[in-house]
Amino acid sequence: QRQMCIRDRVNPAFFGKKAEKIREDSRSMKILVIDGQGGGVGSQCIAQLKEERETDWEIWAVGSNSMATSAMLKAGADAAATGESAVVYNAQRADVILGPMGIAFAHSMMGEISPAMAAAVSGSEAKKLLIPMMRCHVQVMGVSPAPLSAYIAEAVAQLHKMNDRL
């Protein structure tokens, strides 16, 4: 059985031939994009990932709130869900977790990231590509401030390198 998601209600035909191909292709990289607040960072990541048409990446979106989830669905996520349970469930099934740095810290993003969400992200065996955000009150030494688009482009380049290794 698969988990119900917003896309099921929005477009019931979604889980047709495309989804069957994704499930059959064991080499398909499962990318979990997690975001909160308005979903702006996550939706920009998904839009950039969707431009990479030659890839067979399966892009899942999980928002800490429905507004973030909706924004990521509009950006083109293949499947989406909302809330703590969705983060915990999907973090264990993803190959890569992509999102703002705050998703790995409890009570970040104005309290939207619960301790269980942060533990699921940090405890997952998935490769984590975290985008530094200066609003998180965490500064990573050696990381120079850059525009969000530069960090997203770097994440996409890293995903291509990882995909080549599969």
Where are the regions that the model predicts?
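Glycine-rich phosphate-binding loop
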Residues: 79-117
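Short, ordered loop/turn segments at secondary-structure junctions
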Residues: 36-39, 64-66, 85, 103, ...
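Short, small-residue-biased leader/transition segments that mark boundaries at the very start
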Residues: 1-6
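N-terminal beta-loop-helix "entrance" segment that forms/cooperates
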Residues: 57-82, 139-142
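A short helix->loop->beta-strand "cap" motif at the edges of active sites that frequently abuts
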Residues: 56, 123-128
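Glycine-rich phosphate/diphosphate-binding loop of Rossmann-like nucleotide-binding domains
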Residues: 30-63
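Polybasic, lysine-rich low-complexity intrinsically disordered segments
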Residues: 18-22
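Short, glycine-/small-residue-rich phosphate/pyrophosphate-handling segment
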Residues: 130-166
